[in-house]
Amino acid sequence: MYSMSELKTNVGNVTLKNPILLASGTCGVAAREFEPYFNLSELGGVVTKSLSIKPRDGNPTPRVVEIPGCGMLNSIGLQNPGIESFVKNELPYLVEKNATIIINIVGEIMDDYVNAVDFIKARNEITAIELNLSCPNVSGGLDFSQDPKKAFSLVSEIKKITGIPIWAKLSPNVTNITDIVKACVDAGSDGVSLINTVLGLAINRWTKKPTLPRATGGYSGPAIKPIALRMIWETHKKFPKIPIIGIGGIHTTDDAIEFLLCGASCVQIGTANFVNPKISIEIINGLKDYCEKNKLSSISELIGQAHDVSKTFVKV
């Protein structure tokens, strides 16, 4: 029988029981909605909703548009209760459920991020902080993720105030992802989350206007997987020692394996949760089967192996 211990993976100094996490923004504020389906402790981790220093109401509705067969556009606008309310009302729930907790932090200016992180900097319940530098559906939401100097400055300031590991979540809407990655890592980021949603647009042919009130939104789902894989591939090839958290279009065990092979140390499941709330557990079980068939002593043996043409593996 395959041991769960062999599914352990390291993201820098962070050890996760398995490489499957719930992605921010796809599991409510603190994943309470998943309680009927599985125990949060079974996952590698839970990434919270993006949290800001003050509560946010989000964008006008409609906020979500389904793109049939391809995915969805969202323009939520980072609606959230604020970091103080989260710590008071939601963090105890995640602790009670023995979840591995990754707090996603967002802001519009540097002080927003600094103040939010300052509020949680000493919380030993938190495994890592994911800095959302790349939300495409709020004003200024891409600035930090598209400018290496701004990214460096922000991550540097955050590293000054907390010893909690920092993951920088980056945008695919850039010319060269490795420039932004280098800036974040040079500033002290302990890992990079690749990728956030792709900027997209949907048109209502009846109103002859964009479907979303803000016109554009963040595109997610199966269609963005090749973009995510390419950026993870480029990052791992140039910086093989930088821990990567893979995100983007993962809906199956095969998808997760491809991300690991490209260089990700773990992956986050996002849009697939809306289709099948049990998908994360199904992928974890699929990874066990894959490791058994390939006689792997550790899931970490897969990480980056697509860059080594001498190795082949058995299909699940």
Where are these regions (language model features)?
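Glycine-rich beta-to-alpha transition loops that act as phosphate-gripper elements at the mouths
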Residues: 27, 104-107, 170-176, 242-254
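Conserved, mostly hydrophobic/aromatic
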Residues: 22, 46, 86, 103, ...
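Alpha-helix-loop-beta-strand connector modules within alpha/beta enzyme cores
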Residues: 73, 81-98, 146-168, 212-244, ...
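C-terminal helical cap(s) of enzyme catalytic domains, especially alpha/beta-barrels
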Residues: 59-69, 203-217, 260, 272-297
